[in-house]
A protein has these predicted regions:
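Periplasmic/cell-envelope proteins involved in peptidoglycan metabolism and beta-lactam response
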Residues: 1-273, 364-374, 524-574
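Beta-lactam-recognizing serine transpeptidase/beta-lactamase-like catalytic domain environment
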Residues: 25-26, 97-99, 249, 253-294, ...
């Protein structure tokens, strides 16, 4: 009897019913008041489920949108690799490594994993006494994940690891290191914490340096680390001797514009990722804009010779001691003869003599020369930090003052490139730190004949008794050049001393600019001046910038493999 009853009440199971037992039960008892309320509750469950699912969907869409918009801002906090950009190596002309990405770590703290806070803080204080323990404790008390220290070096990472604290999380990332510290600070620039270039070469070539297809091919610069180190050391030494507030140097190949060295002082260690805001740290060679003084006299003389208005031997007569131009009185720093040759005017560096040559040229031709040399345009160079030459109006006396380098402010980079063109046969070149097949722009600013004459005069600036650059007459290197002593633009209490040299002057290969900001008389320095030992008593460029340029050329000459026949015949051949 019992078996038959069970068989009678049995119902067939429908596989398509999603809630068979529940629905069947409700169907049977729908009219019951208690179960009627249960039926209403089911609708509420569906509604709550729908709202919860909608919120989850909205949140997921928002996270996806934000991560796509700026993926580098989203990192995993549970010891998973941070997504930082890989970058190519940077090497110098001799394949010396100067920048590379390495695997490094950030140290973070997960407060929820700390078992004994006091003991944890004691460990941190003992091993890292410079970290702000009070601030760390406040952050721990908030209970949120935070960074203890970013960009750990290997020693710091090992010390933290040895603490054995689970709350310490190590996030791996790609760190950019610069193998020579501050040596290339104004050239290489820096990257941010996500390895995106923010200054210098790192910013200018950012896209190329992040190119995945080129990761195994280093970016090769024209710089020479040995020469960069030598020039930087000598310039640092000079700043101490002459108590200068700043300095700069630039060495360039006169024939193709390749920059072998670029130094700006003071510099800074680019591995420290410090925010540099003090203007004393600007790149003085490419960003600084200065009145460079008498180095402009070479431009004036070259243009006059090119226009066949004068020759090096042309005598300029009736040179006055002073000239009044508009409201300004122009004079020389010392008394010169009333009649001098064009060559002597440049060798002795006469303002008034140069002014009289410029008047022969005329304003329009001088304008055309400046335009052809791009001296008033932003320079073309593979760095982000480029200065803008100051614009001016060609009013009365402008031609006269520009002729000797006052009233016109440009970058040292532009001045050096123009000297390269004047001495390489007249060919305009584009300065570069990247080797390229074609660097000349096929323009000439002067003829080969004019260029040869200028080289001859620049050599005499160094060798002649009345020349202003005798201290650069380095045995065997045939140095020529021109000095410039001027006041800093906008502050007549500060001075800038510059020397641009070319060597060997008979067939120039290199041009070297050396500049010192606010140098003082080095009264304790003993100069070897024309075979005599004398103490320093003067403060013009000929007594500081020229002196240090000579020291630099003497040391880098062998590195550049310049054939020093005098030295060879005297010390090697015998």
């Amino acid at each position: 009897m019992m078996k038959k009853k069970q068989k009678k009440n049995k119902k067939n199971f429908n596989i398509n019913q999603t809630s068979f037992y529940f629905e069947d039960y409700l169907e049977t008892n729908k009219k019951n008041k208690i179960f009627k309320n249960s039926y209403i509750s089911q609708d509420r469950v569906y509604l709550l489920f729908f709202l919860f699912f909608s919120l989850i969907l909205i949140f997921a869409i928002k996270i996806t949108f934000l991560s796509l918009k700026n993926p580098k801002n989203y990192i995993y906090k549970n010891n998973i690799t941070q997504f930082t950009a890989l970058r190519r190596d940077i090497i110098d002309r001799n394949d010396v490594l100067i920048s590379r990405n390495i695997k490094s770590y950030h140290a973070a703290i997960n407060p929820s994993l700390i078992k004994d806070k006091d003991n944890f803080l004691i460990k941190i204080r003992i091993n890292f006494p410079n970290l702000p323990i009070e601030l760390i404790e406040k952050k721990i008390n908030k209970g949120k994940y935070f960074y203890l220290k970013k960009r750990l070096n290997q020693n710091e990472k090992e010390k933290l690891w040895a603490l054995g604290e689970k709350a310490l999380i190590f996030e791996p990332f790609q760190s950019r290191i610069y193998t020579h510290g501050n040596l290339y600070s104004h050239i290489l620039g820096q990257v941010d914490y996500d390895n995106y270039g923010i200054s210098g070469v790192e910013k200018y070539f950012d896209k190329s340096l992040k190119n995945k297809e080129l990761l195994n091919k280093p970016l090769k610069l024209t710089l020479d680390t040995n020469i960069q180190y030598t020039i930087s050391s000598e310039l640092n030494h000079a700043m101490k001797i002459f108590r200068a507030t700043g300095g700069g140097a630039l060495l360039m190949d006169v024939n193709n514009g390749e920059v072998l060295s670029l130094v700006s002082l003071p510099n800074f260690d680019i591995n420290k990722r410090e925010k540099i805001v003090d203007k004393k740290y600007i790149n003085k060679i490419t960003k600084g804009v200065y009145e460079l003084g008498s180095i402009f006299k070479t431009f004036t003389v070259a243009l006059a010779i090119e226009k066949n208005l004068v020759s090096p031997d042309t005598i300029i007569e009736n040179i006055p001691k002073k000239i009044k131009c508009s409201r300004h009185e122009i004079s020389d720093i010392k008394e010169f003869p009333k009649a001098m040759s064009v060559q002597d005017i440049l060798v002795r560096s006469s303002n008034i003599g140069t002014l009289m040559i410029a008047q022969k040229i005329g304003e329009q031709d001088y304008k055309d020369f400046i335009k052809k040399t791009n001296l008033l345009s932003i320079p073309e160079f593979e760095l982000e930090e480029l200065g803008t030459p100051l614009s001016f109006k060609w009013n009365k006396c402008k031609l006269e003052t520009i002729s000797y380098g006052h009233g016109i402010a440009i970058t040292p980079l532009q001045a050096t490139a123009t000297y390269a063109a004047l001495t390489n046969g007249g060919n305009v070149i584009k300065p570069t730190i990247i080797r390229k097949e074609e660097l000349k722009d096929n323009k000439k600013i002067v003829s080969s004949e004019t260029s040869q004459k200028i080289n001859s005069i620049l050599r005499k600036v160094v060798t002649e008794k009345e020349g202003t650059a005798s201290l650069a007459n380095i045995y065997g290197y045939d140095v020529g050049g021109k000095t410039g002593t001027s006041q800093n633009y906008g502050n007549d209490k500060e001075n800038l001393n510059t020397f641009i040299s070319v060597f060997p002057s008979q067939d120039p290969k290199y041009v070297l600019l050396v500049m010192l900001e606010n140098p003082q008389v080095a009264s304790n320095l003993i100069y070897n001046y024309r075979g005599m030992k004398i103490k320093g008593t003067r403060n013009e460029a000929g007594w500081n910038s020229v002196y240090i340029a000579g020291k630099i050329i003497e040391k880098i000459g062998p590195i550049l493999a310049i054939k020093n026949e005098e030295f060879y015949n005297k010390h090697v051949a015998k």
